Amino acid sequence: MVIKPKIRGFICTNAHPVGCEAHVNEQIAYVKAQTSATSGPKNVLVIGASTGYGLASRITSTFGHDAKTLGIFFEKPPTEKKTGSAGWYNTAAFVKAADEAGIYAKNINGDAFSHEIKAKAIEAIKADMGTVDLVVYSLASPRRTDPDTGEVYSSTLKPIGQSVTTKNLNTSKRVIDEVSVEAANDAEIQGTIDVMGGADWELWMNALGEAGVLAEGVKTVAYTYIGKELTWPIYGKATIGKAKEDLDRAATAINAATADLNGQARVTSLNAVVTQASSAIPIMPLYISAMFKVMKADGTYEGCIEQIANLFKENIYSDSPRLDEEGRFRQNYKELEDSVQKRVTDIWNSVDTDTIDELTDYVAYHQEFLKLFGFGIDGVDYDADVSPEVAINNLT
C-alpha cells in the first residue's frame, strides 16, 4: 500500500515502515560517529525501548558500547491492511541492524506494568545474559493496571491548586489560542503518581534483585523532564510534576535496596523534545517550537539521540557527572540556561497566529513530529507501494 500520514488531533494514527527504519538508521549512524565513554554497559535492560529516549538508550548501548540489550515495549503489530505502530517498526529496524552487527538484541512485547512481563524478562536475562549492569526505565503511559489488585490507575495533565489559562499552539488549526485546564482533585493527583511515578520502576528493580539478575555495580536511570517557569503550571508544578517527584523517592529506595551490589539509581533530567507523549501536553508544542528557534540558532539543540549519547558519556559513565541539588543527572543544562529561557519567554509573550513561522520554528516542530512516525525523512519514496507487514526478530 501507499502510506501517507493520518493525523488526528495531536496524534498520527499510522506509521511508515521504511521511514521508521531510515529514522532509526540515522540515529545509529550518529552514535557510531561519536566518541563513546571509555567504560560503558555490557548487558542492558530497557523498559520502554521502542520510541524516544528509551529507543535512543538502546541504540547508544548497542552501537556505542557493543552491549547486549533486552527491550520491553507495548506496540501494535501490523496487519495486511493496517500499519503497525511506529514503535513496532522502530524496533524491527533496530533489531535488524543489531543482527547485522552481530550484537544480541531480544524483545518482549507486552504490558511492562504486569508481573508476567517482569517474569519473562528475568527468564530471558538468566538464559542469555546472566545479569544486567544497566536498567533504563523510560515508560510513558496514560494508564497502569496494578499487578496485585487489578485496579486501573489513570494519569491526568492538570495543574494543582487552581485552574490555569495559558497561551497555546493549536497544532490542528495552526493558530495561537488559549487553553484552560481545571485544577486536579486529590484522586487525580494520586492517580497520576500511581501511573507515572516511581512505583513500577521500584517493582522492576525489586523483582530483578530478588531474582539475582542485577550485576555488581548495577546502574539504573529513570527519565524525567523538569522544565522552567513557562512549563511549570501544566508540567513541573502540576500532576505530572508530582509523579516525577515520586521518581526521586523511588531512586532513594532503589539505592538502599541495591546497596549490597554497590548499585546506583538516579533520576535523569532531560531536554524537552518532540515525542508522542509531549505532543499531547498543552503548552508543550508552543514551548518546544520557541525553544527550537533559540537553540537551533545557537547550535545547542539536542534531540533524543544526542541527549542520550551525551548522557552516557558525560554522566552515567563519567567520574564527574553533572548533578542537580536533588542528585539527579542534569542533561538539560543547555535548555535551562537563563539566556535561553529569557529568549524563549520573549517569543512566547510576542507570538500570535500571524507570526508563528517568523518567531518560532514550528516548521521544525512539525517535521520532528512527522519523523516520529517515519514520515518526512529524506531519501524515502512516500509514493512507493510498501508492505505494512514487517516482523521483529527475536520477539517473545
From Swiss-Prot:
Q: Where does NAD(+) bind?
A: 48-53, 74-75, 111-112, 139-140, 244, 273-275
Annotated Gene Ontology MF terms?
A: enoyl-[acyl-carrier-protein] reductase (NADH) activity; NAD binding; trans-2-enoyl-CoA reductase (NADH) activity
The alphabetized list of GO BP terms reads: fatty acid biosynthetic process
This protein's encoding gene: fabV
Could you say which residues bind substrate here?
225
Could you say which protein family the record assigns here? Belongs to the TER reductase family.
Q: What does this protein do?
A: Involved in the final reduction of the elongation cycle of fatty acid synthesis (FAS II). Catalyzes the reduction of a carbon-carbon double bond in an enoyl moiety that is covalently linked to an acyl carrier protein (ACP).
Pathway it works in: Lipid metabolism; fatty acid biosynthesis
Organism source for this protein?
Colwellia psychrerythraea (strain 34H / ATCC BAA-681)
Which EC class heads this enzyme's classification? Answer: oxidoreductase
Lipid biosynthesis listed as a keyword:
yes
Q: Which HAMAP family match?
A: FabV_reductase
Write the Enzyme Commission number(s) for this entry: 1.3.1.9
Q: What Gene3D superfamilies does the annotation carry? A: NAD(P)-binding Rossmann-like Domain
Q: Which reaction does it catalyse?
A: a 2,3-saturated acyl-[ACP] + NAD(+) = a (2E)-enoyl-[ACP] + NADH + H(+)
An example Pfam family from this entry, by short name, is Eno-Rase_FAD_bd
Positions of the record's site feature: Plays an important role in discriminating NADH against NADPH: 75
What residues form the catalytic site here? 235 (proton donor)
Domain of life of the native organism: Bacteria
Subunit structure and binding partners = Monomer.
Keyword vocabulary terms for this entry: Fatty acid biosynthesis, Fatty acid metabolism, Lipid biosynthesis, Lipid metabolism, NAD, Oxidoreductase
UniProt name for this protein:
Enoyl-[acyl-carrier-protein] reductase [NADH]
